[in-house]
Amino acid sequence: MFNQKNKVTRADYEQWRAGQDETAGRIASDPDRLLFHVEPELGWLNDPNGLVQIGDTYHIYHQYDPFDAAHGGPVLWNHLTTKDFVTYENRGPVLFPDSDLDSSGAYSGSAFVHDGKIHYFYTGNVKHFDRDDYDYVLTGREQNQIHVVAENPDELGEKRIAVGPVDYPDDIGTHVRDPKILEHDGIYYMVLGARTKDDRGCVLVYTSSNLEDWSYATRIELGEKFGFMWECPDLFELDGELILVCCPQGVSADGWRYRNPHQCVWFPIEADWEAPSFKIAGQGMPPMVDAGFDFYAPQSFEDAAGRRLMIGWSGCPDATAKSPTVARGWQCALT
């Protein structure tokens, strides 16, 4: 049985997948399957990752646990392509938790194309279950921000740590994840969702001149606590404005707002690129990206036509295990 206590290699997956054709066929013919949305071939799907356009083809990766529709197994990156966002080709998993850097899961991340190569950044999760001090929040756990370079989007290269636990500020716990890259005037910015040791969500910002060597620069936060963790940050420029989208966890409902277990909101950002510093502009409660109950962990990218495209997970942490499709071997979609 695959679980988050053991590494999973491509060979492990392929041996297991060889016996799943009947199950995959049954899932494909399920009457509850959607017509125009990405859904898992088997098991569980969540966050979109590594969204990028190469030529006339869009590449979409996503978090994938094919082993357990209720998501109790290890997380891989699955790969799909499309030219029209109507028909998709499932290329299969390409990133596996097969090393000491990501043995408990290849968590969310992004892709950035530079000089003909694709730079993937993702969080390698390592849970030290055998340690007496393992508590998931403060100790016994590593979240490594891993860099992989590839020329072929189906064949990822060697894994190396770009930013690791030794690079996090002293007041940050073990929850640091979901790297996303922005370039501005020749400098690269990596944003990471984070949780402080006193349970305040924020976004850490690192800078680099070459996509290889990263230094901590600053953080983005509110003056008052707004959730205990900010996941899946996405910092981008849109129509001359700088926008931060992120997913705060632990925010209390406010009337009709924030009724999900965890939220997805956006902030206008005032940037001093020279310092650098990034401050949340305006006051009041941040607006939700989507007011529905099934939109979380979105990621955006700019395509060749200059459009800012966003894909989200049609689901939400701590809210999806009761889906009726779990008993049929699959769950969730991208939207």
Regions found by a protein language model. Give the residues of each.
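Anionic-ligand-binding alpha/beta catalytic cores of soluble enzymes and soluble regulatory domains
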Residues: 300
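Structural secondary-structure packing elements that flank or coincide with functional cores
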Residues: 303-304
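Short, well-structured beta-strand segments enriched in hydrophobic/aromatic residues
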Residues: 308-309
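Repeated scaffold domains used in trafficking and secretory/extracellular systems
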Residues: 231-233, 296
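Beta-rich carbohydrate-recognition and catalytic domains
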Residues: 1-178, 183-228, 239-291, 312-335
